[in-house]
UniProtKB/Swiss-Prot annotation:
Single biological process term from Gene Ontology: translation
SUPFAM superfamilies for the chain: Ribosomal protein S8
Secretion signal, residue range per the UniProt entry: none
rRNA-binding in keyword set: yes
Cellular component terms per the entry's GO annotation: ribonucleoprotein complex; ribosome
Keyword field: Ribonucleoprotein, Ribosomal protein, RNA-binding, rRNA-binding
Organism of this sequence: Polynucleobacter asymbioticus (strain DSM 18221 / CIP 109841 / QLW-P1DMWA-1)
Oligomer status and interactors: Part of the 30S ribosomal subunit. Contacts proteins S5 and S12.
Family, as annotated: Belongs to the universal ribosomal protein uS8 family.
Protein name: Small ribosomal subunit protein uS8
GO-annotated molecular function: rRNA binding; structural constituent of ribosome
Amino acid sequence: MSISDPIADMLTRIRNAQAVQKPVVLMPSSKVKVAIAKVLQDEGYIESFEIKGEAAKPVLHIDLKYYAGRPVIERIDRVSTPSLRIYKGRHDIPEVMNGLGIAIISTPQGVMTDRKARATGVGGEVICYVA
């Protein structure tokens, strides 16, 4: 079965797994999904991630993070979709929850947080908001 929006599928899998307190979530891997997982790990929203399986069909394993029995990720929302891409210039990059959350942005220099994009002086496609 073909998935029309693999990034939205990734975010939904994470959201659903955390709703039922799963320790690990599995999904088909891609370069963009790995880059998003790297940002989530660097920002402390997930414990770790790794790619397993054969080269033809790699599987991304994400170890979810909980604090006092509650998921660390309170909200994770898709912003830019395949049918409606949302691009922001370097001066228009949004702040999520007044700086308490992050926006994950795909820039020409790679996938990064809103803070790093502002510091680097680049804009790009706003993939999702995480809080």
